[in-house]
Amino acid sequence: MYEYINGLITNIYPAYLVIADRSGVGYKLFVANPYRFEQNVESHVYVEQIVRENEMTLYGFIDENEKYLFNKLLNVSGIGPKSALAILASDDAAGLVTAVANDDASYLTQFPGVGKKTAQQIVLDLKGKLDDLALSAGMTVETVPTTDNQALADALAALESLGYSAKDVAKLQTVLANQKDTTDGYIRSALKFLVK
């Protein structure tokens, strides 16, 4: 129902802020990180209204991209508004988009309230749906590079399945690309490198 509210931010609390519009009505907006806003400053805050059986709640966002990401997260099974705000509070939208693009569920578990199953669900539900956000926000998404060396590709896939992040695997590929080895040999070399 609401797209945004222009007004004076009158109060800032740990979980929400109050913004008064020009007619004097104060709106309580739950936000990911209220301290990104300044008190007693006219602001343009994007808003999402969520209506539940026994409550109507307004959620505020610093920009359209944050609101877009919030709505995408709400489409993930097991993610509600509070969980979505907790994820957004980390202020790592680029990391989230990159993790989804690279199927890196282990990276997503660093967000509050996101366990292994929820992280896998986020990747499953949002894969390919955040590309337009990355483009509009000017984010660069680091994807795991591919290789023609099948043994190396198998080793890298095995390392990812063991829970190593896509970022670590990409670094390993550059280190191991100059070697000729078997899949097992690549895995041993990679593990030695990771333990250092």
UniProtKB/Swiss-Prot annotation:
<dbReference type="Pfam" id="PF01330">
    <property type="entry name" value="RuvA_N"/>
</dbReference>
<dbReference type="Pfam" id="PF14520">
    <property type="entry name" value="HHH_5"/>
</dbReference>
<feature type="region of interest" description="Domain II">
    <location>
        <begin position="63"/>
        <end position="141"/>
    </location>
</feature>
<dbReference type="GO" id="GO:0009378">
    <property type="term" value="F:four-way junction helicase activity"/>
</dbReference>
<dbReference type="GO" id="GO:0006281">
    <property type="term" value="P:DNA repair"/>
</dbReference>
<feature type="region of interest" description="Domain I">
    <location>
        <begin position="1"/>
        <end position="62"/>
    </location>
</feature>
<dbReference type="InterPro" id="IPR012340">
    <property type="entry name" value="NA-bd_OB-fold"/>
</dbReference>
<dbReference type="InterPro" id="IPR010994">
    <property type="entry name" value="RuvA_2-like"/>
</dbReference>
<keyword id="KW-0238">DNA-binding</keyword>
<dbReference type="GO" id="GO:0009379">
    <property type="term" value="C:Holliday junction helicase complex"/>
</dbReference>
<keyword id="KW-0234">DNA repair</keyword>
<dbReference type="GO" id="GO:0048476">
    <property type="term" value="C:Holliday junction resolvase complex"/>
</dbReference>
<dbReference type="InterPro" id="IPR036267">
    <property type="entry name" value="RuvA_C_sf"/>
</dbReference>
<dbReference type="GO" id="GO:0006310">
    <property type="term" value="P:DNA recombination"/>
</dbReference>
<comment type="function">
    <text>The RuvA-RuvB-RuvC complex processes Holliday junction (HJ) DNA during genetic recombination and DNA repair, while the RuvA-RuvB complex plays an important role in the rescue of blocked DNA replication forks via replication fork reversal (RFR). RuvA specifically binds to HJ cruciform DNA, conferring on it an open structure. The RuvB hexamer acts as an ATP-dependent pump, pulling dsDNA into and through the RuvAB complex. HJ branch migration allows RuvC to scan DNA until it finds its consensus sequence, where it cleaves and resolves the cruciform DNA.</text>
</comment>
<keyword id="KW-0227">DNA damage</keyword>
<dbReference type="InterPro" id="IPR011114">
    <property type="entry name" value="RuvA_C"/>
</dbReference>
<dbReference type="InterPro" id="IPR013849">
    <property type="entry name" value="DNA_helicase_Holl-junc_RuvA_I"/>
</dbReference>
<dbReference type="GO" id="GO:0005524">
    <property type="term" value="F:ATP binding"/>
</dbReference>
<dbReference type="GO" id="GO:0005737">
    <property type="term" value="C:cytoplasm"/>
</dbReference>
<dbReference type="Pfam" id="PF07499">
    <property type="entry name" value="RuvA_C"/>
</dbReference>
<comment type="subunit">
    <text>Homotetramer. Forms an RuvA(8)-RuvB(12)-Holliday junction (HJ) complex. HJ DNA is sandwiched between 2 RuvA tetramers; dsDNA enters through RuvA and exits via RuvB. An RuvB hexamer assembles on each DNA strand where it exits the tetramer. Each RuvB hexamer is contacted by two RuvA subunits (via domain III) on 2 adjacent RuvB subunits; this complex drives branch migration. In the full resolvosome a probable DNA-RuvA(4)-RuvB(12)-RuvC(2) complex forms which resolves the HJ.</text>
</comment>
<keyword id="KW-0233">DNA recombination</keyword>
<keyword id="KW-0963">Cytoplasm</keyword>
<dbReference type="InterPro" id="IPR003583">
    <property type="entry name" value="Hlx-hairpin-Hlx_DNA-bd_motif"/>
</dbReference>
<dbReference type="InterPro" id="IPR000085">
    <property type="entry name" value="RuvA"/>
</dbReference>
<feature type="region of interest" description="Flexible linker">
    <location>
        <begin position="142"/>
        <end position="146"/>
    </location>
</feature>
<dbReference type="GO" id="GO:0000400">
    <property type="term" value="F:four-way junction DNA binding"/>
</dbReference>
<protein>
    <recommendedName>
        <fullName>Holliday junction branch migration complex subunit RuvA</fullName>
    </recommendedName>
</protein>
<comment type="similarity">
    <text>Belongs to the RuvA family.</text>
</comment>
<feature type="region of interest" description="Domain III">
    <location>
        <begin position="147"/>
        <end position="196"/>
    </location>
</feature>
